[in-house]
Each structure stands twice: as structure tokens, then as C-alpha cells.
Design a protein with these regions (language model features):
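Conserved "landmark" site that anchors the functional core of diverse proteins
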Residues: 1-335
Length: 335
């Protein structure tokens, strides 16, 4: 598969390297686990590498047949200049060109492959971490003329047409947070202030972290700096300028700023679909509520994947693309 146009920020990702954080390696991995797992379920390739597309997608020419699914909340995609559905397993023939256009709802989507991308793992993962230059395509985003190879696999045509309806997130801009490790280094007034104002995501935000801009600055009881310590995903650091930073997948493994809060797992899933200049608000939840929230998410995800495996949803218009193409040619010759 050859990259004709790379898109804004397209990287190879899988579930990441969380078990190597203790050794100083950033987690990396997909920003949205739900969309990632649904995408791989549609093409019957659990835990396989995907292309994570941010805002504006790539144009890719396939040099061998495959089945693909691009999963996102809303975008336009084309195969040989013809529109095709998102969130659906599509058969792509040798020589065909897939064009993923701008994502119109949300910020990220995932292109999954029935025949896996053939990339050598580093520390049990192929996930790209651009700051350290490891994983994926030599530790960088996709570039024009890059060639990605697939592993050998007999194509299972039965999965063509697998489809799934992705529901919009409820309260997509309301981010649940729990008390952070240095919660007590801030006054109760500051705790209230954090959830009583809205924040804008700065343009200086990326996979490492989202910098936020709010009207009222958060004040520390004593100092912003602490002795460096491990950083959990979703940690909300407050540096000396009083504007919070939410640390995400490509974060460093240790840091020396006070952490007023930690974004819940569901909150991080929401953040993955937000972009610069979007507004968010926080809401405090308990650790127990966060656990229930996560268990509900897992149960729903497992149900959704089971439904896909049982072929509960099928787009009949995409089951026999070759037959449709031949029929169209015959019809053209008869006219």
C-alpha cells in the first residue's frame, strides 16, 4: 500500500506500551480504544495495528487486495472517487485508491485492515511515538511515497459488508475527573473553580497533552513544583502559570508539577475526539463512579463486538463489490 498523500497527522498505532512505562518508555497507542476495537472487529483482526487519522486523512493506493474499515463519527471517504460508507468492512482491489477526507465530527478515526500491516514491533508494540522516534514508520507520521506492506493471509470474504453504527458520545465536552495526587495542594475554592469555568483547548496541544486556557487561573497553596514522580494517563498538571495541562498517551513517564486531578478513562475517550479551540468543562466524580463507568464501557464494548461477530449488522450494498462493478460495466455496454 503506497501513500499518495499522508494527511495531517497519520500514524501507525496499536494498544501501546503501558507495561514498559516503568522502564521510562511512553505509553503511546491509540487515543480512542473504543473506535480502535470496533474497527478491528469489523475486519476480523483483533488487536492488530491500525492507522490513526487526525482531522484530515490520507490518500492510499493498494498494491494488493485487502478488506478495510475506517471507523469514526463522521467523514467522507472515497474508493476510486466513489463514495463508500464509514464504519463498514469494504473490499479493496489491487490498484484501487482510498481517499479519507476531513473528519467532520470528532477529531480522530481508525483505518483497520483484514490483512495486518507488516511492521516490526518494538517493546511488544508497533505504536508510533514521534518524540522518541520509535514504532510505526521509523517513529514518525506517514509521509508521501511511504510503502506499507501487509502480512500474508487468505481473505475471508464473509466479513465484507460488516457494519456498525457509532453513536455520538453523550456530553462529549463534559470531562469527568477524580482527585489528583496533589489535590490537597489546592484550596477548596480552587477545586470549585476548576469545574465552574469552561476551558478552551490550546492550539499547542497534541498526543502528549492538551494545554487548556481558562479565564481564572488556578492558584497553588504553596508551590507548583514537586519532586518528579510517575504520571498516570489523564493527569491534570497545574504549572506555575495556573493553566491546566491534561497529559495523554505520548506523555513523559515522570513529571514535576502538582496534579490537581486525573481524567477518567471515559473522559480520555471523549478528549480524543476534541481538537484545538474546542471548549470543555470538568465535573468531579468519585473513584467508585469512575470504576462503574469503566465497567459499563467494557460491557457495552464486548456486546458491540459480539454483535459484529454474529453479523447482526450487514451492509448488503457492499458484499459483492466486484459483481456490482461488472454489472455496471455490462449496463454501460448495453446502453
Amino acid at each position: 500500500m503506497k501513500c499518495i498523500k499522508p494527511g495531517l497527522f497519520t500514524t501507525v498505532q496499536d494498544i501501546g506500551r503501558s507495561k514498559f512505562e516503568k522502564d521510562g518508555f511512553s505509553e503511546a497507542g491509540v487515543m480512542n480504544q473504543y473506535l480502535y476495537r470496533i474497527a478491528n472487529a469489523l475486519v476480523d483482526n483483533e488487536n492488530a495495528p491500525v492507522l490513526e487519522v487526525t482531522l484530515n486523512g490520507p490518500i492510499l493506493k493498494f498494491e494488493e487486495p485487502n478488506i478495510v474499515a475506517f471507523v469514526t463519527y463522521a467523514t467522507d471517504i472515497q474508493l476510486d472517487d466513489q463514495p463508500i460508507p464509514v464504519n463498514t468492512a469494504i473490499y479493496v482491489e489491487k490498484g484501487q485508491v482510498l481517499n479519507i477526507k476531513s473528519i467532520s465530527s470528532g477529531a480522530r478515526g481508525y483505518l483497520a485492515f483484514h490483512k495486518s500491516l507488516n511492521i516490526e514491533p518494538i517493546l511488544d508494540s508497533v505504536s508510533t511515538h514521534t518524540r522518541s522516534g520509535i514504532g510505526g514508520m521509523n517513529g514518525r507520521t506517514l509521509n508521501r511515497n511511504d510503502v506499507l506492506k501487509f502480512k500474508d493471509k487468505t481473505i475471508n470474504h464473509d466479513i465484507i459488508g460488516n457494519t456498525f453504527n457509532i453513536n455520538q458520545l453523550e456530553e462529549a465536552n463534559v470531562i469527568p475527573i477524580m482527585e489528583g495526587l496533589q489535590f490537597d495542594e489546592f484550596t477548596s475554592e480552587t477545586h470549585d473553580q476548576l469545574v465552574n469555568q469552561s476551558y478552551t483547548i490550546s492550539e499547542m496541544s497534541d498526543r502528549m497533552g492538551y494545554r487548556l486556557n481558562g479565564d481564572e487561573l488556578l492558584e497553588h497553596k504553596h508551590h507548583a513544583d514537586i519532586i518528579s514522580e510517575p504520571i498516570a494517563p489523564g493527569s491534570v498538571q497545574v504549572p506555575i502559570n495556573g493553566q491546566p495541562i491534561i497529559l495523554l498517551n505520548d506523555r513523559q513517564t515522570i513529571g514535576g508539577y502538582t496534579k490537581i486531578a486525573t481524567v477518567s478513562f471515559i473522559g480520555r475517550e471523549k478528549l480524543s475526539q476534541l481538537k484545538a479551540n474546542d471548549s470543555i468543562t470538568f465535573k468531579w466524580i468519585s473513584f467508585e463512579d469512575a470504576a462503574v463507568e469503566y465497567q459499563t464501557y467494557i460491557k457495552q464494548l464486548e456486546q458491540d463486538i459480539d454483535d459484529i461477530k454474529l453479523k447482526k449488522y450487514k451492509d448488503l450494498n457492499n458484499i459483492r463489490p466486484k459483481s456490482k462493478k461488472i454489472a455496471k460495466l455490462i449496463k454501460g455496454n448495453q446502453s
